[in-house]
Amino acid sequence: VPHREDEIALVDTARAELLSLVTHELRTPLAVLSAYVELLSDAATGVSPAKPADLAAWREAAMQQVGRLNLQIDSILTAARPGSSLPLQPTPMNLGEITGAVIREMAPLLRNHSLRWEQPEPEIVVLADESRFRQVLGHLLENEAKYAPVGEPVSIGCWVRDGRAELYLTDDGSGIPREDWEEIFEAFVRRTQRPSTSGSGIGLYAARRLMGAMGGEIRIEPNGFGGSRFLLTLPLAPAVHGILAT
């Protein structure tokens, strides 16, 4: 009986961890959707007048986030079924193209920062689950919106090194203390205890789990300017239609 109870406890723990991972992915699209609704509300009330083209673009972007939420709810329902695991669909993905798309989606949250995107040349094609990569990068950008100094630049760039794709994200702040570089990826650890900053402390833990499941990695390292940066690595895709990923 004790052995059976241990098995049940392990299953319950695994299920709780899985649901924590997949439900966390709802937070970023909800935050982006809220930002677009705020922009539309400010325009409608005259607080911040906007051009008709901008209003149309914001409405379209908000509806895209609603679509993402619907897809992610389906993912959660799938993950909640008995015997299920974290759904992953690795496919060849243009790293620069998808990163640029996520940056554009997150723009309302980062409107108080100057964003520098060093798009790679030539193209970098990686093997990854696009939805999960979007989740990881979206969370990192949401973190920058919360913690990066207002008005200061947030920089993103990527390259190929040692046969793998690398993407970095940094700002001009003081960075994360070196002694916290590993602890911050543990579940329920937050970067700040400020009451005004919301968060569950599961985001970076989920990001590391997702990157690992895709054969990648996420870590923190010095940025060369006295601060720190997040570094993501992913495997390069094999040749696609005769074109090498490198």
Regions found by a protein language model. Name each.
Residues 91-92, 116-124:
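Conserved catalytic submotifs in the C-terminal HATPase_c
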Residues 61-69:
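Short alpha-helical segment of the dimerization/phosphotransfer core of two-component systems
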Residues 176-188:
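Short conserved segment of the HATPase_c
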